[in-house]
């Protein structure tokens, strides 16, 4: 990964495709989903996630919980993990950067729900730096103070919400060609090995 907007000299390669290259077949239209924000995940090593859960765990419109087990997690409000498809009953899915990138942004953008997140700071092969707030996802402040205002707006304007979903689906779709992705990865590796002197440079 690289810092978003500062990756000109970085080498980005998808080395964890089995975990990150996930897309869901969502058959539930946005208008038929619950007017709810959902988040499940571990808050370990993520102050942002902890702060979100502590702020909204008693809010009936925000379904959020820490999926860690054990006494150390009780203070944040724990719950069992749920399947990715179980998230799809909600119109909005929170997306957080953890130790680095926000890994669930990839599958959320393949669905009929909308990713909600502060502006991403890190960038991977998914090109998060090219994501546009209000176009590919709903951007909220780092302190989430405008979260409910934002979701109320898109609940009241489902046609604009659908536009974001369509744009997100289009963005995610460019990564679905596995042969093309493999070819790009090989070219990236080839160029890296050439630049580091591990392969002789070519004219192509």
Model-derived regions: residue spans:
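Catalytic binding pocket for nucleotide-activated donors in carbohydrate/polymer assembly enzymes
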Residues: 81-204
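Nucleotide-sugar donor-binding catalytic core of glycosyltransferases
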Residues: 1-114, 118-139
């Amino acid at each position: 990964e690289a810092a978003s907007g500062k990756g000109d000299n970085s080498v980005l390669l998808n080395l964890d495709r089995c975990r990150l290259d996930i897309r869901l077949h969502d058959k539930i239209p946005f208008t038929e989903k619950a007017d709810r924000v959902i988040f499940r995940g571990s808050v370990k090593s993520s102050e942002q996630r902890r702060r979100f859960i502590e702020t909204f765990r008693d809010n009936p419109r925000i379904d959020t919980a820490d999926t860690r087990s054990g006494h150390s997690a009780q203070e944040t409000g724990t719950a069992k993990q749920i399947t990715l498809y179980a998230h799809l009953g909600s119109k909005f899915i929170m997306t957080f950067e953890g130790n680095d990138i926000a890994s669930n942004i990839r599958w959320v953008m393949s669905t009929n729900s909308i990713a909600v997140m502060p502006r991403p700071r890190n960038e991977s092969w998914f090109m998060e730096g090219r994501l546009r707030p209000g176009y590919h996802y709903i951007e909220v402040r780092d302190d989430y103070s405008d979260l409910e205002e934002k979701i109320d707006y898109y609940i009241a304007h489902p046609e604009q919400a659908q536009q974001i979903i369509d744009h997100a689906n289009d963005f995610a779709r460019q990564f679905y060609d596995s042969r093309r992705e493999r070819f790009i990865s090989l070219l990236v590796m080839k160029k890296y090995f050439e630049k580091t002197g591990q392969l002789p440079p070519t004219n192509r």
